[in-house]
Amino acid sequence: ILSNYNELSAFQNGGWDALSSDTQAAINRLKSVNTNWGDILFRDAFSQEYNLSLSGGTERVTYYTSFGYYKEDGNVDGVGMDRFNLVGKTSYKVNSILKVGASMFANRRKNTNYLTDAYGMSNPVFYSRKANPYFELYDKNGNYNYDYDIQNNTDKDLGFNIFEERQNTSNESVVNSFSSIFDAELRFNDKWKLTSQFGYQLEKTSREEIADWESYAM
């Protein structure tokens, strides 16, 4: 406030009485502001899961199929994960001694998060401990307010607003995986059998990090 009103030197030389009435009013207004950063930055975590399975068969053929979906909203807005998974298994009895089978597992997992800046300000746990309780995120017109005092001992003079940072940045990763297993069993009698198994696995991970020109991370 003193810097915005260009009265820092006046305060250093003459104290409170040297400030203008507008500056004193702006400072006094801070007494009515008590921002609860815990309530603003965090929320209750919530997760939901759905599964559907189908199985059956005959004396020679059996099958099992399942589909699952899981979604988790983290305790920070914009942080979460969702996952799709598919499982398929089947076996076939060729004759009295030979049985073959195949299994397939497919999974897609997407993680969303905030983009962490070099100073760690976008970390809500860290920021909630440094932010002043009298700082308001928005002005009376609904525009972002900026905190210029959050980071000391740096030449980074950009203002910071953690909600704007979330709006202008994103950190997303997607993992797609697929695996299959093929097996065969030769059963000669109750004591002797021969089994063979072959497996294949493929996994692909992609990541996208976005920080536009208005973000503190830039």
Predicted regions and their residues:
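Residues on the lipid-exposed face of transmembrane beta-strands in outer-membrane beta-barrel proteins
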Residues: 52-58, 86-92, 180-186
